[in-house]
UniProtKB/Swiss-Prot annotation:
Protein name: Protein yae1
Primary gene name: yae1
UniProt-annotated stretches for the region deca-GX3 motif: 57-97
Highest classification ranks of the organism: Eukaryota, Fungi, Dikarya, Ascomycota, Pezizomycotina
Organism expressing this protein natively: Aspergillus clavatus (strain ATCC 1007 / CBS 513.65 / DSM 816 / NCTC 3887 / NRRL 1 / QM 1276 / 107)
Keyword field: Cytoplasm, Nucleus
Subunit architecture: May form a complex with LTO1.
Similarity comment: Belongs to the YAE1 family.
Region (Disordered), start-end ranges: 1-53, 105-136
């Protein structure tokens, strides 16, 4: 049997020599190489699932980091704000008390005004002194009211801590931590008002009045019991 005879199984096992048109096709591919096959397209659900997981991970990361940072910021900033807030409140309370005191306080009556049967000249003189005191008291009240209005504006939390945004350094720098910068900035503003209002003088007077108030309360309680 000749070797070049066609075998019925050549189409299956490929033992027959290549056909002429197949040889020409391979030569054409060698002369013009084909680009590598592209990656198979992903199923349509994968991009959507990937975006969902990226978004969920991003939100979880923000929530975890936010909780840690907020708690740390609260622990460091709350004592500073509470201390400065109490000092600023003391300044405003003193000024507000003075304004109300001058507003509701009547003129001081002289003994001559309380006596009957005084001459017309004495009554006129006493009335003139009362008018002068009322005018002086009114001017003093207006002066304190202007000072109080200015203090309310300058002791506002945004005004006290203005100018420190973005000036925070790294956590390792002890001298430039945010709470230290806030304390320094706020202390300078509040201290100037404490000196202007003489807070120390008022606190001494309040400390002196506290024992009297306690004694009066005790006496009142004893009288009610009896």
């Amino acid at each position: 049997m000749a070797t070049n005879t066609h075998n019925s199984l050549d189409d299956i096992f490929g033992s027959s020599p290549p056909h002429e048109h197949e040889h020409e096709h391979h030569q054409h591919q060698d002369l013009h190489p084909q680009p590598p096959p592209t990656q198979a397209p992903e199923p349509s659900d994968l991009p959507s699932l990937r975006r969902q997981h990226v978004t969920a991970g991003y939100r979880d990361g923000i929530s975890a980091a936010k909780g840690a940072q907020v708690q740390r910021g609260f622990d460091a900033g709350f004592p500073v704000g509470a201390q400065l807030g109490m000092r600023a409140g003391t300044v405003l309370g003193i000024l507000e008390g003075l304004v109300r005191g001058y507003e509701g306080r009547g003129g001081v009556k002289k003994p001559a005004q309380l006596q009957r049967g005084k001459t017309a000249s004495s009554a006129t003189e006493g009335q003139g002194e009362g008018d002068a005191e009322a005018a002086e008291r009114k001017a003093r009240r207006e002066e304190i009211l202007r000072l109080y209005t200015r203090a309310v504006k300058e002791l506002d939390v945004r005004a006290v801590f203005s100018g420190v945004d973005g000036a925070f350094a790294t956590e390792g720098d002890e001298e430039e931590k945010p709470e230290i910068l806030l304390r320094q900035k706020g202390d300078g503003v509040v201290s100037r008002w404490e000196e202007r209002v003489r807070v120390a003088h008022w606190e001494e007077n309040m400390d002196a009045l506290e024992p009297r108030d306690k004694e009066e309360e005790e006496e009142k309680a004893l009288s009610e019991q009896s």
